[in-house]
Design a protein with these regions (language model features):
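NAD(P)-dependent short-chain dehydrogenase/reductase
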Residues: 146, 153-158, 163-166, 170-201, ...
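Hydrophobic ligand-binding cavity/cleft-lining segments
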Residues: 218, 277, 303-352, 356
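Beta-strand/loop substructures that line and gate deep hydrophobic ligand-binding cavities in soluble
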Residues: 388-442
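N-terminal Rossmann NAD(P)H-binding glycine-rich loop of SDR-like oxidoreductase domains
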Residues: 3-23
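Mid/C-terminal beta-alpha module of Rossmann-like enzyme folds, strongest
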Residues: 219-266, 299-300
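Alpha-helical substrate-binding/gating segment
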Residues: 184-192, 200-234
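Conserved Rossmann-fold NAD(P)-dependent oxidoreductase catalytic core, especially the SDR/UDP-sugar
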Residues: 85-90, 96-139
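NAD(P)H-binding glycine-rich loop region in Rossmannoid oxidoreductase-like domains
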Residues: 35, 39, 45-94
Length: 461
């Protein structure tokens, strides 16, 4: 199947794209910046530059069988100024309208248009039990979602042959990205608690399930609403307790609503509002959830993060077999090429003439302007599929870096999984955790750019 996708660089889009390519689908992705998208999408795709205020290029619709619409300005990243609210609305309404127009004008083969919507449609409803048949709520987000979904109506009128399932997504739980990732640093330090009185309902879903639901919608679901939430919503009080149990930490004092509103402004409605949704339509459509309890979802996501460990994963698809890529990464001297210059990274010595399990590297670098000596131990070496390096001596209490080279879609999915913990326990994490997280992200973003320059990436005209 040839699928046109928007929002492919987002939390859901990256995982959905991998799932679709893995089963043999071909993707064309509409993106704002083709170079940035190439580095962020862990799957092969043809990328076409597009701005939601302009018509979709006709060539993007060529031989397209289905559309998946995940695009929209983030709602939870900054305070809602009037300009931000306008962008939240316009990116969704105009963008969806343009996509629908493209299907009507240039997409005769399109048989499905899967629309990613949001549970914000329901507004703040207290403990009322809601599902796909429930009425619209009140508030800014409810108005946005209603206007957003209304743009789909021309498809029902002029192309009744096109299936248009609408997935109203709730709070997506993922180890990296989304609401949970924002909560984790403070909870790991045991300085966070419930929000307000904790009675507000949270309709959540595991990332794997929301990806599975979009695939299900693409393949089988008819026109209509699907609730993108797990079968068992919880209150914020229950969520907080389960999160602390899974991490093995204690709860702290609750955050007063007045403080939350002062910090977040109108955006506080996202965390203080209550939405209790049951996925009746989703279950009736035949979808089977992998994670139907919060405990099972959190245990799956958080097991690697206990004991104050932080984890980041970077994935990059390269159009070469692992055998062609491995020699570059197996040579420690090439590390200088893919490390930011300001770190002054220098390899001093290698303990063995040929790299393998047990090899040690000594090098120097600067972190936040401070010089450090570092010794790395190659803990495992399995060419050309995997190697693991760990810090033997250095500034971290723990540093574990797994390099995986996975055959995928005619090339290689390169995955870097980094687990680290700062020294001095919670004091070190509180004092420098955010800065270190930012520095680690910057280092690996630079690494992705340099790897893309050397090995090439997507087909992005």
């Amino acid at each position: 199947m040839h699928i046109l996708m928007t929002g492919a660089t987002g939390l859901i889009g990256r995982e959905l794209g991998k799932a679709l390519v893995a089963r043999g689908d071909t993707l064309t992705c509409l993106v704002r910046d083709t170079d940035a998208a190439r580095r962020r999408m862990p799957f092969p795709a043809t990328c076409i530059a597009w701005d939601h205020t302009r018509p979709v290029p006709a060539e993007a619709m060529r031989e397209v069988d289905a559309v998946v619409n995940l695009a929209g300005e983030p709602v939870a990243d900054t305070r809602w100024s009037e300009s931000k609210k306008a962008l939240i609305l316009d990116s969704r309404v105009q963008g969806t309208r343009r996509l629908v127009e493209a299907v009507l004008e240039h997409g005769p083969r399109v048989g499905a248009f899967v629309h990613g919507s949001a549970t914000g449609f329901h507004g703040d409803r207290g403990s009322e039990r809601l599902d796909a048949s429930s009425t619209k709520g009140t508030g800014f987000l409810a108005d946005v979602v209603a206007a957003w979904e209304a743009q789909l109506q021309p498809l029902a009128t002029r192309r009744p042959d096109v299936r248009v399932p609408v997935v109203r997504t709730g709070i997506v739980l993922a180890r990296q990205g989304g609401a949970l990732a924002e909560m984790l640093p403070m909870f790991q330090l045991s300085v966070a608690g419930r929000l307000g009185d904790g009675r507000q309902w949270m309709s959540w879903i595991h990332l794997d399930d929301i990806v599975g639901l979009f695939v299900h919608a693409l393949d089988t679901a008819p026109f209509g609403i699907l609730e993108g939430v797990a079968p068992r919503p919880v209150t914020n009080r229950e969520f907080t307790a389960a999160l602390c149990r899974s991490l093995g930490v204690i709860q702290n004092l609750p955050a007063p609503p007045l403080v939350i509103r002062a910090l977040f402004g109108e955006r506080a409605a996202i965390v203080l509002g209550s939405t209790r949704i049951e996925p009746a339509a989703t279950r009736a459509s035949g979808y089977s959830f992998r994670f139907d309890t919060l405990e099972s979802a959190l245990d799956d996501l958080l097991a690697p993060l206990r004991g104050g460990v932080r984890q980041r994963i970077w994935e990059q698809w390269l159009p070469h077999p692992a055998e062609a890529i491995w020699p570059f990464f197996g040579d420690a001297n090439n590390l200088e090429e893919i490390t930011p210059p300001n770190l002054n990274f220098r390899v001093l010595r290698t303990s063995t003439p040929v790299v393998g399990a047990g090899t040690r590297f000594d090098y120097t670098l600067r972190l936040n302007g401070v010089p450090f000596g570092w010794q790395t131990l190659i803990a495992s070496w399995d060419p050309p599929r995997r190697f693991v390096d760990t810090q033997a001596k250095g500034p971290y209490a723990l540093w574990h870096h797994a390099h995986d080279f996975v055959p995928f879609a005619g090339g290689t999915l390169m995955r870097d999984t980094v687990r680290y913990r700062l020294p001095a326990g919670w004091v070190g994490a509180l004092a420098g955790g955010c800065k270190v997280d930012s520095e680690v992200t910057r280092i690996f973003d630079y690494r992705a750019r340099k790897i893309d320059e050397r090995f090439g990436g997507q087909s992005c005209p």
